[in-house]
Amino acid sequence: MLDPFGKRAESLIREEFGDLLALLERVPSAISVEEPISLVSWMLESENPPQELVEVDNLEELRDLFKFYALLGAASISPYGLEAEVVKRATLRLYSERIKASKNLSETMLPVVPVGENEIPHNDLNILERRMDRNLSPEEKEKLKIKYKIPIKDLLNLWGSSLKEVYIRNGYAYLRWETALKMWEKAFEKRFERAVNILYEYRDELPEFYHRLREKLEEIAEEYFKERGEMFKGTASPLRFDLFPPCVKEALKGVPAGMRNYAITVLLTSFLSYARICPNPPKKDVRIKDCINDLKIIEEEILPVIIEAGNRCKPPLFEDQPHEIKNIWYHLGFGLTDSPTMEDSGNSTWYFPPNCDKIRANAPQLCKPDKYCRGIKNPLSYYLKRLYLEGKKKEGETSE
């Protein structure tokens, strides 16, 4: 399988399973937890994937697809955690090497087609491929050849540089092999991130298989990033208010009567607590006492923010409804109390932040999407995405 998101893969999933969720249900009965690990673990020992992973028999393509989507399902449990990042890096490199070996992009997700023999005017081709330059080696000449064309509308979604660098004719951009491959790599990263965000919404429905696989990936990821001195992402850390999603920022300003309980007790309480204490929950039904040892973080960093936001409401929530503080603790998983202890953690459910569609339905005034909201299904995913992008930005600045 050259591309797990490509045309052949999509056709296979549709014909054999109907949809992606049905495929994910089938995976645990088709492969062991250990099998997908091989697609990632090579990163601990080498810069390049071993040849036995690059050369896959066509008869094994369904099993190969099972392995990739097993990793994707496990990564979706923590879409901006270390596990997802190491899976993305490993599989991107692996499938890129397979495409290089095949010298073919036609079956990938990239909407390119080979360039016809006389499609580009002769004079233009002489300039683009430097055909008159006799100093070029055969390898250099091959690199300069125009191989593919892509519709401009598809190019714009992936191209990060000036269009002055691109030869455009009749609504198509014409690409050399290396440029086309780099665009496929960008497309793979985007599709991977979108897929784990979509699956994140269904993570509680995933079989236990994926949670066990995530634990193994976590071990590999921690070793991989520790050796390279890279930033750990998605771990408990002080709140970054500047990276909060628009709906949370709106709730922090205070809201009118009718929205107060939902905005403060339901949305803010769940979002702030998970964002600060456990942004990437390791399991279903996690409790606060599974993540911290005392109530100091809640009492000093989370509760004051919730109370301040409640006091900005009109009328002020906690002056108008003093008992609502018990509901705050209830939503944090301590039961209906106003003076909890750590032992009370687990007396009720620690509510997870509501998904975006529920926020739109219950408090549409809070929903004011920005450019980072695209593809996001939950406000916590938004925050993790912003933290992730911020970390990547700092890594880039450090390496310069």
UniProtKB/Swiss-Prot annotation:
It comes from the Archaea. GO terms for molecular function: 4 iron, 4 sulfur cluster binding; DNA-directed RNA polymerase activity; metal ion binding. [4Fe-4S] cluster binds at C247, C356, C367, C373. Keywords: 4Fe-4S, DNA replication, Iron, Iron-sulfur, Metal-binding, Primosome. Gene3D superfamilies: 1.20.930.50, 3.30.200.260. GO terms for cellular component: primosome complex. One of its GO terms (biological process) is DNA replication, synthesis of primer. Its cofactor is [4Fe-4S] cluster. Binds 1 [4Fe-4S] cluster. InterPro entries: DNA_primase_lsu_euk/arc (IPR007238), DNA_primase_lsu_PriL (IPR023642). HAMAP family: DNA_primase_lrg_arc. Belongs to the eukaryotic-type primase large subunit family. Regulatory subunit of DNA primase, an RNA polymerase that catalyzes the synthesis of short RNA molecules used as primers for DNA polymerase during DNA replication. Stabilizes and modulates the activity of the small subunit, increasing the rate of DNA synthesis, and conferring RNA synthesis capability. The DNA polymerase activity may enable DNA primase to also catalyze primer extension after primer synthesis. May also play a role in DNA repair. This is DNA primase large subunit PriL. It comes from Thermococcus kodakarensis (strain ATCC BAA-918 / JCM 12380 / KOD1). The gene is priL.
